[in-house]
């Protein structure tokens, strides 16, 4: 039986934006008009009483255009430098776009400890909820500038899922460059069917996931499946949807293609 879901019913929404959505590959700049459409969607949700946290990738991708990227991209120091340079531009772009809707952005850069250490988790929760109460829009990213192997989260899909768990969000939206979860890789199998709902992450579901081939992306569908496990176990619905077109949140609400991960029923606090 198909699960009916109204996005407007979600009180607290975490939206993760992939780097491929933020970066214009032709100009090596930020997709400003697309970002404006996203922040317009965010403003609409806030106006009707919902709360929104943004988790955005893109700092490394943007910064790498400054440090003359791919030849040495895999070297940690170059990636860290790119993150430092790109984060400034990324935050500024969000700030300017949200400001046009009368909204204030608040930047948070996090490491693994902020999400898994009990004391740090409590602090992360308190800060995020306080910013939301103040009417700000939290903009979260991993702190790639200082992260090491032992402190890295690894990808923003799981980071967003942990954020959703920590603040007890009702909905996690992963905006990507694909419509949802397909039974096979649609790049090689264009006619493969897409799942509209996932009620349990089985071995068969895990086998459908592929790793990202994009040099700027950390996870691909594998990390999204892992994010789904975190969200579903926390009682949070997760949606994977294509965010490449304008007004991606409105597109979901209008019935655009997406895959819904149905959460495990549990008491929310």
Swiss-Prot record:
One of its GO terms (cellular component) is cytosol. Belongs to the glutamate 5-kinase family. Keywords: Amino-acid biosynthesis, ATP-binding, Cytoplasm, Kinase, Nucleotide-binding, Proline biosynthesis, Transferase. It is found in: Cytoplasm. GO terms for biological process: L-proline biosynthetic process. It is an enzyme of class 2 (transferase). ATP binds at residues 16, 218-224. Pathway: Amino-acid biosynthesis; L-proline biosynthesis; L-glutamate 5-semialdehyde from L-glutamate: step 1/2. GO terms for molecular function: ATP binding; glutamate 5-kinase activity. It comes from Rhizobium meliloti (strain 1021). Pfam families: AA_kinase. Catalyzes the transfer of a phosphate group to glutamate to form L-glutamate 5-phosphate. It comes from the Bacteria. This is Glutamate 5-kinase 2. Its EC number is 2.7.2.11. Substrate binds at residues 57, 144, 156. It catalyses: L-glutamate + ATP = L-glutamyl 5-phosphate + ADP.
